[in-house]
């Protein structure tokens, strides 16, 4: 049966890459790692006004149930091993969103002896959301950018 005949009968044709990318990007389960004021904006995104549920995004309390970590706030040296431990407990494939100036590069506390100058020194970061604190719209835009990145990523990497 030719492709044109299948499409006329109502079948949708796609590749496995596109199907898996669509499924992964449409059911992201983030885990919050809120450390400071950025976490309040992260809570706004989960509330009724922005409603992440419509994107298939449901916050999970456990790293073993989540595939996205949102790091929001100042990461200090004492908290860095805990961040790495939680990241290692997440199943593959996993992604990280760095939210706010403090998580991106230390922010206001950049020159403090006890602050990690960016969570990307501890875990690999996929999307950076700028701002101090970033708005809920900025985080939502960052999540949509992560969804686009997941859709473009090949399923079987060598």
Curated annotation (Swiss-Prot):
[4Fe-4S] cluster binds at residues 37-38, 102, 132. Its EC number is 7.1.1.-. Keywords: 4Fe-4S, Cell inner membrane, Cell membrane, Iron, Iron-sulfur, Membrane, Metal-binding, NAD, Quinone, Translocase, Transport, Ubiquinone. It is an enzyme of class 7 (translocase). GO terms for cellular component: plasma membrane; respiratory chain complex I. InterPro entries: NADH_UbQ_OxRdtase-like_20kDa, NADH_UQ_OxRdtase_20Kd_su. Signal peptide: none annotated. Its cofactor is [4Fe-4S] cluster. It catalyses: a quinone + NADH + 5 H(+)(in) = a quinol + NAD(+) + 4 H(+)(out). GO terms for molecular function: 4 iron, 4 sulfur cluster binding; iron ion binding; NADH dehydrogenase (ubiquinone) activity; NADH:ubiquinone reductase (non-electrogenic) activity; quinone binding. Binds 1 [4Fe-4S] cluster. GO terms for biological process: aerobic respiration; electron transport coupled proton transport. It is a peripheral membrane protein. It is found in: Cell inner membrane. NCBIfam families: nuoB_fam, PRK06411.1. Belongs to the complex I 20 kDa subunit family. NDH-1 is composed of 14 different subunits. Subunits NuoB, C, D, E, F, and G constitute the peripheral sector of the complex. HAMAP family: NDH1_NuoB. NDH-1 shuttles electrons from NADH, via FMN and iron-sulfur (Fe-S) centers, to quinones in the respiratory chain. Couples the redox reaction to proton translocation (for every two electrons transferred, four hydrogen ions are translocated across the cytoplasmic membrane), and thus conserves the redox energy in a proton gradient. This is NADH-quinone oxidoreductase subunit B. It comes from Legionella pneumophila subsp. pneumophila (strain Philadelphia 1 / ATCC 33152 / DSM 7513). The gene is nuoB.
């Amino acid at each position: 049966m030719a492709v044109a005949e299948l499409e006329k009968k109502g079948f949708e044709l796609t590749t496995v890459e596109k199907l898996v990318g669509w499924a992964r990007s449409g059911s992201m389960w983030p885990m919050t790692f809120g450390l400071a004021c950025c976490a309040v904006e992260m809570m706004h995104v989960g509330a009724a006004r922005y409603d992440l549920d419509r994107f298939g995004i449901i916050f999970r309390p456990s790293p073993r149930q989540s595939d996205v970590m949102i790091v929001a706030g100042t990461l200090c040296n004492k908290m860095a091993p805990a961040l790495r431990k939680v990241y290692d407990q997440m199943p593959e494939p996993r992604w990280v969103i760095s939210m706010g100036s403090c998580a991106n590069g230390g922010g206001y506390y950049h020159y403090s002896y006890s602050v990690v100058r960016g969570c990307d020194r501890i875990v690999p970061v996929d999307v950076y959301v700028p701002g101090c604190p970033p708005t809920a719209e900025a985080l939502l835009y960052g999540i949509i950018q992560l969804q686009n990145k997941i859709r473009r990523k090949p399923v079987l990497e060598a």
